[in-house]
Swiss-Prot record:
Primary localization: secreted
Name assigned to this protein: Neurotrophin-3
Localization per record: Secreted
Source taxonomy: Eukaryota, Metazoa, Chordata, Craniata, Vertebrata
InterPro entries for the chain: Cystine-knot_cytokine, Nerve_growth_factor-like, Nerve_growth_factor-rel, Neurotrophin-3, NTF3_N
GO biological-process terms attached to the record: cell surface receptor protein tyrosine kinase signaling pathway; modulation of chemical synaptic transmission; negative regulation of neuron apoptotic process; nerve development; nerve growth factor signaling pathway; neuron projection morphogenesis
Propeptide segment residues: 4-119
Glycosylation sites per record: N112
Annotated function: Seems to promote the survival of visceral and proprioceptive sensory neurons.
Family: Belongs to the NGF-beta family.
Region feature Disordered, mapped onto this chain: 38-60, 90-131
GO molecular function annotations of the record: growth factor activity; nerve growth factor receptor binding
UniProt organism field: Eunectes notaeus (Yellow anaconda)
């Protein structure tokens, strides 16, 4: 799922919960594919569920090798979820050309003096990126320096629910 900054509407809590439920049902939330496609002798495709032990063994092997899976979202799921929009997140099939802007433009466009006074200087939009100390955009990193200068660990997977 790619996120970019776009003003497309307000996202209600109920619609977000519904969307998260859809992601969990699709097996995307935990970076797992619940079913795997297999071909039979006559060439037709069938779905085969992986056993839980087999899935855990694969996950632990991937963790030892330092592999962090990239979640791939089916284009059909994105088309179904177009109504879920927010000013900060956009579900898209395309990879963004550049990272989202972290600050508003320095020069206000509006002629209204009240608005201009409010926007003087850089105002922070509340968007945070994972970046290193040289302020370069980082896409695949396991540790980083946060906005306060502290060394932090970037999680490859977030586990939810009881362990």
């Amino acid at each position: 799922i790619q996120s970019t900054s776009m003003d497309q509407g307000i996202l209600t809590e109920d619609s977000m919960n519904s969307f998260i439920r859809t992601l969990i049902q699709a097996g995307i939330w935990k970076n797992k594919v619940p079913k795997q496609m297999a071909r039979t002798k006559d060439g037709t495709q069938t779905t085969v569920k992986k056993s839980e032990a087999e899935a855990d063994a694969t996950a632990s092997q991937d963790t030892r090798l330092g592999f962090q899976p990239i979640v791939s979202v089916d284009a059909e799921l994105l088309r179904q979820q177009r109504r879920f929009s927010s000013p900060r997140v956009l579900l898209s099939e395309n990879t963004p050309l550049e990272p989202p802007p972290l600050y508003l433009t320095e020069e206000p466009v509006a002629l209204n003096r009240t608005s201009r006074r409010k926007r003087e200087g850089k105002s922070h939009r509340g968007e945070y990126s994972v970046c290193d100390s040289e302020s370069r955009w980082v896409t695949d990193k396991s540790s980083a320096v946060d906005i306060r200068g502290h060394q932090v660990t970037v999680l490859g997977e977030i586990r939810m629910g009881p362990s």
